[in-house]
UniProtKB/Swiss-Prot annotation:
Belongs to the SprT family. This is Protein SprT-like. The lineage of its organism: Bacteria, Bacillati, Bacillota, Bacilli, Bacillales. HAMAP family: SprT_like (MF_00745). Zn(2+) binds at residues 67, 71.
Length: 153
């Protein structure tokens, strides 16, 4: 789906569910990471996350568009457009728009190596994510020398 098709879909959904025209822009914003879409109060445009279309399909995207159109139409009418407002929650139910969107699959970060250090005097162990210069630090418990324990295999 390209930007023009998205614009047409948004205009069509606005007329079908709200019986009002959508006179601004709807477009994909690749910078959106954790949200399905957002309604911009100043420009009245709607930004959408394209990942929802690729991961969850057009039905999910239509739900997000309807949700953002609720914000859009209520804001232009001067009614309560925020999530906590009664006008907003009522309109969501009327048009069948979701209150929240389905979460995206999280991109898993590579797991960091955990380094283990041990005090030579008292045996206190320290787990660290970052490498530590053992010549600059001493054990906080007894003041003894610290040595890195290297696990084999």
């Amino acid at each position: 789906m390209d930007e023009q098709q998205l614009q047409q879909l948004t205009e069509q959904l606005s007329l079908t569910y709200f019986k009002k025209p959508f006179r601004h822009r709807a477009y994909f914003n690749s910078r959106l990471k954790t949200t399905g879409g957002r309604y911009l109060l100043n420009s009245h445009n709607i930004e959408l996350n394209k990942k929802y279309l690729t991961e969850h399909g057009q039905k999910e995207l239509e739900g997000i568009i309807k949700h953002e159109l609720c914000h859009y139409h209520l804001h232009l009418e001067g009614k309560g457009y925020k999530h906590r407002d009664k006008d907003f929650r009522t309109l969501l139910k009327e048009v069948g728009a979701p209150r929240f969107c389905t979460p995206l699959e999280k991109e898993k970060k590579p797991q960091r190596k955990v380094r283990t250090y041990k005090c030579e005097a008292c045996g206190q162990t320290f787990l660290r994510k970052r490498k530590m210069d053992t010549s600059r630090y001493v054990c906080g418990k007894c003041g003894g020398k610290i040595k890195e324990i290297i696990k084999k295999g």
